[in-house]
């Protein structure tokens, strides 16, 4: 599931990244918790993970929250409850509740004089301009995009895993550069997701890249409900027992660093890149100046 805000809010969000990124998490989590506990929809406590992204394919500013939501939850009797494969919350209701909660927190921060206003957001210091912004955003239909995991939960983890510890753009998308410009690949969603090349001045490329550096010590991956640190060990074990799931064993348990690199990136650091021979650790003796271990084939 993806929670997105209207682009009209981008200037004020960018001027207050820590506060208004946190507000995205607050609104998304409060929406999911409130609706999931409602007996009209599911009537259970659920678990989910939220991840903040701030970029679009062209490195434009596009703050939104990705969520991975369990397919059910625990009811008041600690019994597992789901809706038989269908998502238990109506998309339209999610979007409306999320809109109300986010704009309510934004208004509260403005009333408490906790917001800053820079660049194109300066005009929102004025009460009437800010009210017009809120009115415009209330009138809009917000987007809460939901999609089932066609290839299983692991495919979702693999997809989002590409972005959780990266920022904005990867090296392979940078096609070329000169002293003045940078050309990089972008996905054109208006043309069936076709890849095309975009060329921008070097300073503009750096500006776009730096827009997506998160605030210092900001936590982008957050766990809620049954998946929170407080509940995960006991309640998730209980859920697995109810569903008859096999005990989870980490794929990294008792593996060496080299084995984990092989598993994650399919790169064998123990294989010589020159001759293809197997590398073995070589520890220097006490007469060797270097104190570091070397790999030799």
Set out the residue ranges of the language-model regions.
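Beta->alpha loop/short-helix hinge microenvironment recognizer with preference
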Residues: 2-297
């Amino acid at each position: 599931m993806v929670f997105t805000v209207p682009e009209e809010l981008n200037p004020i969000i960018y001027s207050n990244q820590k506060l208004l990124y946190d507000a995205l998490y607050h609104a998304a989590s409060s929406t999911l918790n409130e609706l999931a506990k409602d007996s009209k929809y599911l009537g259970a406590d659920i678990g989910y993970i939220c991840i903040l992204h701030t970029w679009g394919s062209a490195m434009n500013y596009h703050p939104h929250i990705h969520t991975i939501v369990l397919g059910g939850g625990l009811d008041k009797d600690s019994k597992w409850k789901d809706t038989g494969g269908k998502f238990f919350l109506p998309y339209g209701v999610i979007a409306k509740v999320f809109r109300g909660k986010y704009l309510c927190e934004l208004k509260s921060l403005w009333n408490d004089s906790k917001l800053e206003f820079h660049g194109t957001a300066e005009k929102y210091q004025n009460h009437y301009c800010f009210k017009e912004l809120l009115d415009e955003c209330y009138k809009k239909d917000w987007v809460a995009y939901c999609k089932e995991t066609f290839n299983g939960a692991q495919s979702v983890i693999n997809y989002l895993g590409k972005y959780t510890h990266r920022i904005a753009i990867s090296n392979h998308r940078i096609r070329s550069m000169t002293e003045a410009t940078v050309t990089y690949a972008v996905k054109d969603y208006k043309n069936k997701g076709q890849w095309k090349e975009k060329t921008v001045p070097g300073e503009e490329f750096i500006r776009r890249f730096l827009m997506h550096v998160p605030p210092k010590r900001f936590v982008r991956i957050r766990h809620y409900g049954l998946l929170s640190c407080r509940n995960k060990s006991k309640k998730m074990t209980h859920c697995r027992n109810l569903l008859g799931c096999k005990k989870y064993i980490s794929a990294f348990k008792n593996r060496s660093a080299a084995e984990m690199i092989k598993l994650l990136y399919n790169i064998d650091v123990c294989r010589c890149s020159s001759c293809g021979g197997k590398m073995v650790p070589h520890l220097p003796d006490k007469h060797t100046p270097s104190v570091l271990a070397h790999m030799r084939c």
